[in-house]
Amino acid sequence: MFVIEAVKSDVDANIQHKINQKTKPLGALGQLESLALQIARVQYRGDKQSLSTPLQITKPTMLVFAADHGIAAYGVSIAPSEVTTQMVHNFVQGGAAINVFCRQVGFELEIIDCGILQPLTGQANVIDQRLGAGTKAMHLAAAMPLEKVAQGFEFARQLVARHIDVGCNLIALGEMGIGNTSAATAVMSAMLNIDVEQCVGRGTGIDDATLVIKTKLINQALDLHQHELVSPEAILAHVGGFEIVQMTGAILAAAEQKILVVIDGFIATAAALVAVKLSPQSRDYLVFAHESQEQGHKLLLQQLQATPLLSLGLRLGEGTGAALALPLIQAAVNFYNQMASFDDAGVNNVV
């Protein structure tokens, strides 16, 4: 499994003092200050002399995990499962929102096939980490065998290690999969032991009648498996998705290696919830990009004591919110590294 250390807090006062001594009123950079503190804590390696080392973001990488869901065949979405493969093809061609935003902000983009129904053939730039051809319909059977969760975690560990080996110290998580808001809703409901109705949202933009069907089937799934939902891994196996499994594994793998993870929207945050339940220490490494319009996302963020960087009304997924957050993360790094202190600038200290 994953061995994750909490970030060291013994130098928090030193880091905060450095932030406070920048040429600004106390706290005037708002959330960027807490973000800089978090990044500095993550990148601190135990030697107090290293506090003078500039923070840095190197080779930031967006990982988009794609998979299909058996429940999608039962009327929970306005889009058929074929759209998953079509959108993965769009990613490969560079035409999706995530491609545009990654190019704009400087993210390397990698697409991972975790188990779409119709895999693309001959695409070297789609990473094959397939756990199957879509999950089973979770209201009729377990979404996947338990061993697929362990396999997905190992795939994710290897993926993250490969990027760290070439100098990446920040990953962001996105996803694509018709039906995955249903899986994320079920995971959230089971993990937090709260009603589906508090978690479920409109996903691709479903109408009221479809929302009723979606809610009913998720409740059926949770009722069917209620005696088996005994651990985070079991919850993933019975009502999760292949991409949610691998995002969870990627979070844990990145935290184990002490690098930052930028969490996108509702689906990625559901994976973050599972990761934090498995390893509370992993929470230290997570930056939450935005609050989406999915009903359950705000509650998920509250449960994780997360203040997102953005609130733009997004509900696209793909990692789009995480991509848009990268300039803010870089801004936090840059002010920490480059902004003058009161002493340096010869400015009266107003702190």
Curated annotation (Swiss-Prot):
GO terms for molecular function: nicotinate-nucleotide-dimethylbenzimidazole phosphoribosyltransferase activity. Pathway: Nucleoside biosynthesis; alpha-ribazole biosynthesis; alpha-ribazole from 5,6-dimethylbenzimidazole: step 1/2. The active site is at E318 (proton acceptor). It catalyses: 5,6-dimethylbenzimidazole + nicotinate beta-D-ribonucleotide = alpha-ribazole 5'-phosphate + nicotinate + H(+). One of its GO terms (biological process) is cobalamin biosynthetic process. The keyword Transferase applies. SUPFAM superfamilies: Nicotinate mononucleotide:5,6-dimethylbenzimidazole phosphoribosyltransferase (CobT). InterPro entries: Nict_dMeBzImd_PRibTrfase (IPR003200), Nict_dMeBzImd_PRibTrfase_bact (IPR017846), Nict_dMeBzImd_PRibTrfase_N (IPR023195), Nict_dMeBzImd_PRibTrfase_sf (IPR036087). Keywords: Cobalamin biosynthesis, Glycosyltransferase, Transferase. The keyword Transferase applies. Pfam families: DBI_PRT. Its EC number is 2.4.2.21. CDD domains: DMB-PRT_CobT (cd02439). Catalyzes the synthesis of alpha-ribazole-5'-phosphate from nicotinate mononucleotide (NAMN) and 5,6-dimethylbenzimidazole (DMB). PANTHER family: NICOTINATE-NUCLEOTIDE--DIMETHYLBENZIMIDAZOLE PHOSPHORIBOSYLTRANSFERASE. Belongs to the CobT family. This is Nicotinate-nucleotide--dimethylbenzimidazole phosphoribosyltransferase.
